[in-house]
Amino acid sequence: MHTYVTQELPAVINANFSFDERQGLMGHSMGGHGALLIGLTQAVPFKTIAALSPITNTLVNEWTIDAFTRYLGPDKEVWKQYDSTELVKSGVGKHVSIRVDYGSLDEYSDLLKCDEFEAVCKANGYENISFHCHEGFDHGYFFISSVIEEVLKDQYQRLTRE
């Protein structure tokens, strides 16, 4: 999926549409996790990242521990390259503009760990990351449909800033 998002899809888009270098990436939940990983570790092609209710700390997430053990083996040091919180602790990705949105009533907040991720970002001097907790929203479709316009407008503004 990483190669598809960072190489194959941009190549198809650039071959068929008129685009410049101002490109952003957005994802929700596990897709938000992927968007954060790509944003933190890739200098190009994405200048902005929007992560909606992202999984931010895979090392302590019961959803990912079993999968990581099966796919990557038991060594948690190997897993760190796939954990946004660990990447921020190592100082990578300060160049990209990132926005994180999540609902205050997200039933998976204990797994997403957005609050902890925000604290780690602040402690490590990440100035290009903003966090937006939306009161009364959970993890689902209504949350996404309610915030998507605001998030897209923000992505556009961040992409067109010089």
Question: Where do the language-model regions lie?
Answer:
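Non-catalytic cap/lid and distal C-terminal segments of serine-dependent acyl enzymes
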Residues: 1-162
